[in-house]
Amino acid sequence: MAGHSKWANIKHKKAKEDAKRGKIFTKLIREITVAARLGGGDKDANPRLRAAIATALANNMSKDTIERAVVKGAGGDESANVEEVRYEGYGPGGVAIIVDCMTDNRNRTVGEVRHAFTKSGGNLGTDGSVAYMFTKRGIISFAPGVDEDALMEVALEAGAEDIITHEDGSIDVYTDPHDFSDIQEVLIEKGFNSENAEVTFDAETKAELDTETAEKVMALIDKLEDLDDVQNVYSNANFTQELIEQIG
């Protein structure tokens, strides 16, 4: 089954990985800490913590760092003052965007998020304005060159919902969010190490963009991801490999 290439998106993100690694790790640690605080430090009994750990491992975070974050969250600390908030809006070209945040000051966060939208030619919407366009699911992505038949057999047996092979040979394994970490663990045990793995909001219908609009949308996403309170940004933009290469 062919589809748009998530691998192109990953390559774009990897190009900025070194500069943003510290910020990415900060966000991952925050998610682990909050997940442990809300649901306890036992990952087997805490699906959210299990998913957070799986994502951290996929981003090459050390087990020691992960364990410290779990202990910190389960023990209770300043993270008790942090709350989760979600903002929805539209970017250039009418692209739908969801922004998940963790903050100890809602007024500060909404001001920063609104400013990013406004400066980039978008606008912050109301709750529910775009969320209906997305489905929450786990996506485990593999670079071109992986044994497609073997991966498909293991993934389906482990409970994957769908497997999509893209034109460039990259493969996405889709899972129910609750099964995400278990399926990823099975794949790792069988020797399939992913290039990216996350529980995300996946748009059912993608927005097709020209190069100019794609650059503006990417700039907005970068602005949002650079905000300290922002954990994740999701959009329905279809960043094809051709667009990624043109944007550079």
UniProtKB/Swiss-Prot annotation:
One of its GO terms (molecular function) is DNA binding. Keywords: Cytoplasm, DNA-binding, Transcription, Transcription regulation. Its main location: cytoplasm. Pfam families: TACO1_YebC_N (PF20772), Transcrip_reg (PF01709). It is found in: Cytoplasm. Disulfide bonds: none annotated. GO terms for cellular component: cytosol. It comes from the Bacteria. GO terms for biological process: regulation of DNA-templated transcription. Gene3D superfamilies: 1.10.10.200, 3.30.70.980. PANTHER family: TRANSCRIPTIONAL REGULATORY PROTEIN YEBC-RELATED, TRANSLATIONAL ACTIVATOR OF CYTOCHROME C OXIDASE 1. HAMAP family: Transcrip_reg_TACO1. Belongs to the TACO1 family. This is Probable transcriptional regulatory protein FTT_0655. It comes from Francisella tularensis subsp. tularensis (strain SCHU S4 / Schu 4).
